[in-house]
Amino acid sequence: MLSLIVRFCTKYMSIGVVLIGIFSIFWPEVMKPFAPKIPTLLGIIMFGMGMSLTPGDFKNVFKQPKNVAIGTVLQFIIMPAAAFALIHLFALPPEIAIGVVLVGCCPGGTASNVISYIAKADVALSVSMTMVNTIFAPFVTPFLVWLIAGAWVNIDFMSMMMSIVKMVLLPLLIGVGINYFFPRQVKKVNTIMPMFSALVVIITVGCVVSLSGRTILDNGLVILAVVILHNLCGMLLGNFCARRFGLNKAQTRAMTIEVGMQNSGLASTLALMYFTAAGGIAGAIFSVWHNVSGSLFASYCVGKDEEAEKETKISSAVELK
C-alpha cells in the first residue's frame, strides 16, 4: 500500500505542482507560512539522498574518473553560460534574471538519476555526477552566481556558501554515514523519500507562487520560454559534448540528462533566502519542466532501443532464410 502511495505521488508530481501553483495564485495566504521552512525541508531531501548512496556509488567515481570529471565541468559551464546568454537575450529584469542564473549555477538534481534509469542510460555515471556536483556546489555555485550576476545584484558569497553547506553538503554526508552504519533501517526510510521529495517540490512551488503571483501573471510566459530554452540548451549541448568526447550510447544519455536537469529546489530556496520571491519563479517552473522534458527524452530513448531491437530481429530472420 505504501509503495503504491509513493509511486502515485512521484508519478503525478507535475500535476500536483501545476494545481498548487493555480491554488496559490488565488489563495496565497495558505502557502506563505511554509516559506521559512523550505531550507529545512530541502536539507531533509539532501539527507535522504545521502542515505540512498552506498560505498559502491563512491567507488564508481573512481571507475569512471574521466567521464565524471567531464560531466562535472560541463554541468558548471554549459548551464551557467546558457543562463547568462538567455537573461541578456530576453532582457529579463534583475529580480527575475537572478532566478535563471541560480538555476544555471546549481548542481544536478536527483530526479536525473530516475530519468537515467528509465532511459536505459548509465545510471552509475548519473549518480556519480550528481554526487560530485552536489559536493562541489557549496563552493562553485556562489562563485558562479557572483561571476555572472555580481555586477547588478549584491551577492553575499560567504553567507551563500555556508547556507549551501548547511542545507546540502552536511545533510548529504550525515545521510551517507547513517546508511553506512545502519543499512537495514535506512532501507525502510528510503522507500518514502521519493514521496517526501515530491511533496517538498510542491510546497516550494506553492510558496514561490504565493509570494510572487503578480509577477508570474505578468511575466509567466516569458519565464516559461526561458526555462524551456535553458533546459534544452543543457540537454543538447551535453549530448553534443558527450559524443565529441567519445562516450558510448548509455554514457551519452546519462550526460544529456545530467547536464540538462538541475537542482531547481535549491535554486528557488536560495532565491527566497537571498533575493526576492520573483527570483524563485524560474526554479519553480524548472521543477515541472525538466521532469516533462526528461520523461520525453527517456521515452524517445526507449523507443529507439525498441526499433533497433526489431531491426536486429528482422535482419537475423532474413539471414536465417
Q: Which residues does each PLM region occupy?
A:
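Alpha-helical transmembrane segments of multi-pass small-molecule/ion transporters
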Residues: 1-321
